[in-house]
């Protein structure tokens, strides 16, 4: 990986990063969609043994290949995380029985559990309905919540967003995503790289709205990622959508999202990346982009990607 590194300085701090100009010619890089640039950076950083095949496919010179995507974090909702936590508890028991240190058994990458699937609406249209429903949920699922509380207190790299806080893809965008991730570099410095993630929720592509590459996976894939395994996908075909103008007054982001959904449902989009481009993107807020990206599962796309732009960076600041 060191062959692909370059460095930059921000406020006197030296940072390393993967320089794609060391992998592709300027013309090749210019033609490559931004979503594939992030995917390529991920392979160069995490799975360089697969880089020749991925580079060959990315430049149109090689056959289809598998991409061993390595997320730097993942998110679960409560219905898919409990089996993973039970496995970690079991592994810790076995390690302890064999005389090892059970506290050494932890998620390999940061994992966040969002509890948003268990609350049942029994009180509504009344003051205090939210609190009443949460109280019933805590009493009904007390054993499960005790187990989750143990996991949060015992496991490194594991955090819990409690019920009543927000749904998983909302919390991902508003509170968890970093857009640019910092990791330890081999020389003891700091390596900057794109925030890449997966989550066990079909609407995870909503995070693509702020330039974070991520998509939904099944529970078993999530558990494998929690153990440091890659999430393999076929090298994706990218479908571009050019936005040439701003929305007219009275036309909402929901109108745009439904129109895009109607258009793409007429085509085979399963397993493909959709990427937005064009001068009209500058007029779309991060919330509008999120509304569009959230609809990815409605037409089968893996990713609905919006490149990071100056306006969004100002919003993040």
Language-model regions: role of each:
Residues 1-317:
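Fe-S-dependent hydro-lyases/dehydratases of central metabolism
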